């Protein structure tokens, strides 16, 4: 099968198509992880994006549904240097997603690093694509709207409330689902925290009706400025119970606190990002997947810059205490992914911190009855 990648600047890259015979548009990004292609493809945060893997060999250990981060592939397309085995090909085919191999992924990555993320089109076809069609494809890419203008979260958020009971329940939390990864839910459940997953547009009254011990605002795709409704809900929750966030959830909390976000040139996507904990001085290697960040010059007043990225000094975490006398006033969030999926487990202890925070709040509630 033939494959072609078309960029908005007119660059055309030809290769071998695999997966589904299809044509997709999306923002072109790269991921530096050496493993985890199944987790990456099924991560809802990649909705609207065509993913280039910098590691050259993909597909060489098969596909297993136990690795899924959602119910199916969420990335628009997949770009690799070498594709091995039939399982990855069949996987993409099953979900109608095209892939392209036998291309210079180093060239693509360097282009993204120098020019920034770009609009792109990936097409696979049983017949060779003519030069005339190439011109039409370039026009399609140029007329495609910017990902910042697309509201991507509604496409990946749950449409109904879903409850996940922990085997040995200690506490419970509400996860505001902006595209939550299964690994995040698993990390909570493994620690005895039952989860109520709610749609991204759920109001604070309903969230509080579940009597959670804390709220987690999840990861997800797209521009956080599109999530002002969710940010307003989160703002209304401040001071009523502990609020935490991961990735997009961190950015939403930033906005809810009165801060601002901005788009990174090419984002952080991979499992090798060093992050410094400002309070301890310790450095963790983290998994990341985001194209936006908190504006460091506009960190919300009274907030603590808790974590910093050592590669580019971007904000990796903030915290704020609304009420020094009560744990219900605690707000904290991180930009990186402590659950990994894929990546290092250096920051996994943050889920222990979440559960400990929830336990403390639960004890406070009980003592006041």
UniProtKB/Swiss-Prot annotation:
Q: Which InterPro entries did the record assign?
A: Anth_synth/Amidotransfase, CarbamoylP_synth_ssu, CarbamoylP_synth_ssu_N, CarbP_synth_ssu_N_sf, Class_I_gatase-like, CPSase_GATase1, GATASE
Its name, as the record gives it, is: Carbamoyl phosphate synthase small chain
Q: Which pathway does it serve?
A: Amino-acid biosynthesis; L-arginine biosynthesis; carbamoyl phosphate from bicarbonate: step 1/1; Pyrimidine metabolism; UMP biosynthesis via de novo pathway; (S)-dihydroorotate from bicarbonate: step 1/3
Organism annotation: Methanococcus vannielii (strain ATCC 35089 / DSM 1224 / JCM 13029 / OCM 148 / SB)
Question: Main role?
Answer: Small subunit of the glutamine-dependent carbamoyl phosphate synthetase (CPSase). CPSase catalyzes the formation of carbamoyl phosphate from the ammonia moiety of glutamine, carbonate, and phosphate donated by ATP, constituting the first step of 2 biosynthetic pathways, one leading to arginine and/or urea and the other to pyrimidine nucleotides. The small subunit (glutamine amidotransferase) binds and cleaves glutamine to supply the large subunit with the substrate ammonia.
Catalytic activity as recorded in UniProt:
hydrogencarbonate + L-glutamine + 2 ATP + H2O = carbamoyl phosphate + L-glutamate + 2 ADP + phosphate + 2 H(+)
Provide the active-site residues from the annotation.
Answer: 247 (nucleophile), 337, 339
Binding partners and assembly: Composed of two chains; the small (or glutamine) chain promotes the hydrolysis of glutamine to ammonia, which is used by the large (or ammonia) chain to synthesize carbamoyl phosphate. Tetramer of heterodimers (alpha,beta)4.
What does the record list as GO biological process?
A: 'de novo' pyrimidine nucleobase biosynthetic process; 'de novo' UMP biosynthetic process; glutamine metabolic process; L-arginine biosynthetic process
Task: Give the matching SMART domains.
Answer: CPSase_sm_chain
> Which family, according to UniProt?
Belongs to the CarA family.
For the protein in the UniProt heading, the enzyme class is: ligase
SUPFAM superfamilies documented for this protein: Carbamoyl phosphate synthetase, small subunit N-terminal domain, Class I glutamine amidotransferase-like
Q: Which gene encodes it?
A: carA
- The residues that hold L-glutamine are 45, 220, 222, 248, 251, 289, 291-292
A GO MF label = glutaminase activity
Keywords recorded for this protein, A-Z: Amino-acid biosynthesis, Arginine biosynthesis, ATP-binding, Glutamine amidotransferase, Ligase, Nucleotide-binding, Pyrimidine biosynthesis
An example of a Pfam family matching this protein is CPSase_sm_chain
Domain (Glutamine amidotransferase type-1): give its ranges.
172-364
Question: Which EC number applies?
Answer: 6.3.5.5
**Chain segments carrying region CPSase:** 1-168
HAMAP family this protein is in?
A: CPSase_S_chain
